[in-house]
Design a protein with these regions (language model features):
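Conserved N-terminal entry element of GNAT/NAT acetyltransferase domains
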Residues: 1-29, 33, 187-188
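Helix-loop element at the rim of GNAT/NAT acetyltransferase active sites that forms part
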Residues: 28-44
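Conserved active-site tyrosine of GNAT-family acetyltransferases
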Residues: 31, 150, 155
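Active-site rim helix/loop that mediates acceptor-substrate recognition in acyltransferases
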Residues: 39-67, 76, 82
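Glycine-rich acetyl-CoA-binding "A-motif" of GNAT/NAT acetyltransferases
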Residues: 70-73, 145
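Conserved acyl-donor/pantetheine-binding loop and adjacent beta-alpha core of acyl/acetyltransferases
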Residues: 74-104, 164-171
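Conserved acetyl-CoA-binding loop-helix of GNAT-fold acetyltransferases
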Residues: 107, 113-126, 148-152
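Conserved beta-strand-loop-alpha-helix junction that forms the acyl-donor binding cleft
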Residues: 112, 136-147, 163-174
Length: 188
């Protein structure tokens, strides 16, 4: 089965403040699975995961992909104005007020490499074209599969920051995050 055929079997739905409560538990489980297990794992307190996701949905919107009845992926986006870490002063060519920030892209390990992240990002960009001119995403520099995908989608690095995260409770480590940018459409 080819990638296009596999993507047609995926069911993509909008995610917003109205349907989020219905899927909140599954989204929290996916968030914890995607970011606390595997090669790129970090520690996230399960008690704060829900609060983090609740805030993201209040500020923006996203989409979900189901394979059968299983939630396989979630992507969330908002105005770049909500990302307090974005180095706007260093990047005056990127108009923060006209830029979409893709804040989360998570795919369950069982479904990685099947085009789900690409499908979700493509959908976010298609839905954003009437409102935003640019899009920015922030990726851990060690997450090479994500960096490769975003490069294929036309993103290029514009800045980096360092964030302190946890390997385990009480064990901090420094993570270098790369901001990637691309145009959605030209400015009016």
């Amino acid at each position: 089965m080819g990638m296009d055929e596999a993507m047609r079997m995926n069911r993509l739905f909008k995610l917003d403040q109205f349907n989020y409560p219905r899927f909140r538990g599954k989204i929290i489980d996916l968030y914890l699975h995607a970011f606390t297990s595997g090669e790129y794992a970090q520690y996230i307190d399960p008690r704060t995961a829900g609060t983090t996701l609740d805030a993201l949905v209040r500020k923006g919107w996203g989409n979900m992909v189901f394979v059968g009845d299983r939630l396989a992926g979630v992507a969330m986006a908002m105005s770049l104005q909500h990302d307090r870490d974005f180095p706007a002063a260093e990047l005056p060519a990127i108009a923060v007020e006209r830029s979409l920030y893709i804040s989360e892209v998570m795919v369950h390990a069982d479904y990685r490499g099947r085009g789900i992240a690409r499908q979700m990002v493509d959908d976010l960009l298609a839905r954003a074209v009437d409102t935003f001119t640019d899009v920015v995403i922030r990726v851990w520099d060690k997450n090479l599969p994500a960096l490769a995908l975003y490069h294929k989608l036309g993103f290029y690095p514009v800045a980096s920051i360092r964030q302190t995260k946890l390997e385990a409770p009480g064990r901090p480590f420094e993570m270098r995050k790369i901001y990637l940018h691309r145009s959605i459409r030209s400015a009016d």
